[in-house]
Each structure stands twice: as structure tokens, then as C-alpha cells.
Amino acid sequence: MTTIVLIWDNFGPMHDDRVRAVVKAYGKRARIVGIELFGKSDTYEWDNEANTEFEKVTLFPGMEAGSVPPLTIAARIVSRCRALKAGHVFLCNYDQTAILLAAAALRLSGRGVYTMACSKFDDLERNITREFLKRFFFLPYQGAISSGVRARDYMRLMGIPRDRIASEYNTLSIDRIRALSGQQPAPQGTPFADRHFTIVARFVPKKNLAMALDAYELYCQTAERPRALHLCGSGKLEAMLRAKAAEMGLADRVVFRGFLQSDGIAQALGHSLALILPSVEEQFGNVVIEAQAMGLPVILSDNCGARDKLVRSGVNGFVIEPDNPEGLAFFMGLLDRDEALWRRMSASAGTFAEKGDVARFAEAVQMLVPAA
């Protein structure tokens, strides 16, 4: 029986979802092990829950990225994979030195090595020479799990053959989200008139939250009874955003919820009219899956990778430019006023949710490593 190892920096709810799905898909035909490098995330405040449903190993308990030298990390990855007699290893963060070293060593030892990523060419301004040199980081990999259209194309640019790129990478358990919400997905559940707009994001520049507040101000100027805007998240821009909302006279309508764990997000979305994601840079946007699990239309920027497969403008949401607050305000007003439109989009969002379900990730793993 082969052993398949899935490695991430730190396990949050989405990683637990994915490993559980792979365990379920393979059954007794493979041993599945999840490895997290560090016991703490240096980016997210999510709960790192105790797990009893699958084998999980933490290489550096109580530590976070940046606290351990790359060579030490690589050596620990290789050592543990050898001890587990891993036949196939899936790794994230191909651009990190430790991952490159570990992937190369594992490939040279005869193991199947695969990368998992959702980077897109349009994530930032690219230098062609640098992109060509970056292909070196992909040499150890025999395949990849990616997302959408643009991320898959980027994997091809990096030298991964088209027929060795599986999808979808960015996935969550739809059942878990709905159970955590404690509510029926829209259009059932909370009445239309009682719903608010919601943004779930870190308070950092690339999330474009200042533009979202500009759009919300424009929306409030034309709405007969403006709905509240809930901001779920935390970060270095919080003080600035609070001050901006106050200066606009919107302090009583903009609700700062703080960082929410998975259950809090699911519950907030259960009372929402729509999710807003106006990022200037967004590799994917996993919260889109959470929103669709709860039947919500999504208004997001065309920079977001999730729009490739999950959002169809005018069908289950709207796509905007990240520098267009007038457009965002227009679509907010449209959903606010037109309950029939909202209900149609809500029903469509619910059907699209399956495209982001964690079962798609398990299918991707099975495409690259067929069960015996």
C-alpha cells in the first residue's frame, strides 16, 4: 500500500478538509499523512485544531515560519518522508528554498513529487527573465494541483505539462461550512430585508478595503435604507479603516467584527446579502467558496482567481475592476433593491458551490496518483 504525504506550512480548517477528503477518496487503498511544518501560522490567526480523523505530523511544534533555517526544514521534511516510506509527496510554497531542497532530494530518492499552487501571471508585475529563471524551482515536480484557468496556465509557463496539472486546489468542505453556520443557505434562512453586505479579508493593502469603503459611501448616498457593511478581519490597516469610516459619517453602519474563526465566518455569511472581494491582488479567494456554500452572490474584482470557475457575472455575482468604486456601488445597489434578482443569483451560487467542494481536491490527487 502506497503512502501519500500532503505538506503545508501550517494546518488551518481548509487543510484539514483536504486531507480528510483524500483519506475518504482512497479508503484503505493508500495511507494518507498530513504534515505541517510549523505549529503556528505567521499569517493567519486560525485555530489549529486537534485532529483524530487522519494521521498528522508537526515537524516544528510551537514554532512559525522564519524561525528555522531552510536547510534544517528541508532535512526534517526528507527525514520524515523517508521514515513514513512515502511514495508520493505533495508540497506547497514552491518558491521557498527549503521546499526546493526537499523536493529535489525526494525526487532524487525516487519518490513522486508534486507542487500545489494557485499563483497567476497577473498577480503582480512580472519580469520575463525572472520568470524564465523561476522554472528552475519547478524542475523536481512531476505534476501539479492548481486552480481555475489562469493558475493552470501559469503552471504550464513554469514547465509543468498540461496533462500533469490537476484541479481544483482551492477547495473547502461545503458540508462543514453549512453545518457551522447553523442556518439554511440563502435564499432560505434570514429574510432578504434583514441581510447585510460582508467583506472577509485581512486588513492589508492588497485587499483594497479603502476602495470598498468609497463604494459603500456611494451606495449609501442612493439607497433608500442602506444595509450595514460588516468587515470581518484584522490587520495593520484597521485603525486607518476605522478612521476613514468615521470621517465619512459611516461609523454606525460599518461594523468591524474582528478576526473570525470558521464558525464565525459561516454564521456571518448566513446573515449576508452578498460577499464583496475587491482585491487588487488575490491568487484565489477561498472565502468565495464559503459564500457560495451559504448561497450568496459574490461581487469580486477580476484579479481574483476564484472568478475563473466559480463566478459568472450576471448569473451568480458580478465582476468589477479593483479601481472602480462606482461599479461596485452600482452592483451593491442592484442587489439591495431587487429581491427577485438576488434570489435568482442566490440559487445559482448554491449550485456553483460544488465546484469548490473539497471532493474536487481529492479527485485532483487521484488523477496524479491513481489508486492501485
What would you call each of these model-derived segments?
Residues S313-G314, F318-P325, G333-E339:
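Conserved acidic donor-binding segment of nucleotide-sugar-dependent glycosyltransferases
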